[in-house]
Amino acid sequence: MKTVAGLLYSKDHEWVKVEGNEAYIGITDFAQHALGEIVFVELPEVDDEIAQGDAFSVVESVKAASDAYSPVSGKVLEVNEELDGAPELLNEDAFANWIIKVELTNPSELEGLLSDKEYAEFCEKEA
């Protein structure tokens, strides 16, 4: 299982890349491996308001459909339209292919997320 230093992680297997008051959010390598071959990603609407813990996307694979939960609260600024036509990009590199970009409405929520090392330890216990 791969992690990327500098990103933050949730126990629901989402990653967050913070840039100022904005954040990119995607699913982790652990999540895409567990799902298997991804065939569809349901994207939210730009300007949607999401709260920490809310489902913001459904990721469907040949095995299952799984909600992706937002690790932070914010307003959706952008969605990764490439995933509409090529959901398999999440299998190819889950960390290079974000799902949404949000404007953070409560940056203090970031303090409750895991570092790459903490997340790797969490996943080892889950496996």
From Swiss-Prot:
<dbReference type="InterPro" id="IPR033753">
    <property type="entry name" value="GCV_H/Fam206"/>
</dbReference>
<feature type="domain" description="Lipoyl-binding">
    <location>
        <begin position="22"/>
        <end position="103"/>
    </location>
</feature>
<dbReference type="Pfam" id="PF01597">
    <property type="entry name" value="GCV_H"/>
</dbReference>
<dbReference type="GO" id="GO:0019464">
    <property type="term" value="P:glycine decarboxylation via glycine cleavage system"/>
</dbReference>
<comment type="function">
    <text>The glycine cleavage system catalyzes the degradation of glycine. The H protein shuttles the methylamine group of glycine from the P protein to the T protein.</text>
</comment>
<keyword id="KW-0450">Lipoyl</keyword>
<dbReference type="InterPro" id="IPR011053">
    <property type="entry name" value="Single_hybrid_motif"/>
</dbReference>
<dbReference type="InterPro" id="IPR002930">
    <property type="entry name" value="GCV_H"/>
</dbReference>
<comment type="similarity">
    <text>Belongs to the GcvH family.</text>
</comment>
<comment type="subunit">
    <text>The glycine cleavage system is composed of four proteins: P, T, L and H.</text>
</comment>
<dbReference type="GO" id="GO:0005960">
    <property type="term" value="C:glycine cleavage complex"/>
</dbReference>
<protein>
    <recommendedName>
        <fullName>Glycine cleavage system H protein</fullName>
    </recommendedName>
</protein>
<feature type="modified residue" description="N6-lipoyllysine">
    <location>
        <position position="63"/>
    </location>
</feature>
<dbReference type="InterPro" id="IPR017453">
    <property type="entry name" value="GCV_H_sub"/>
</dbReference>
<dbReference type="GO" id="GO:0005737">
    <property type="term" value="C:cytoplasm"/>
</dbReference>
<dbReference type="InterPro" id="IPR000089">
    <property type="entry name" value="Biotin_lipoyl"/>
</dbReference>
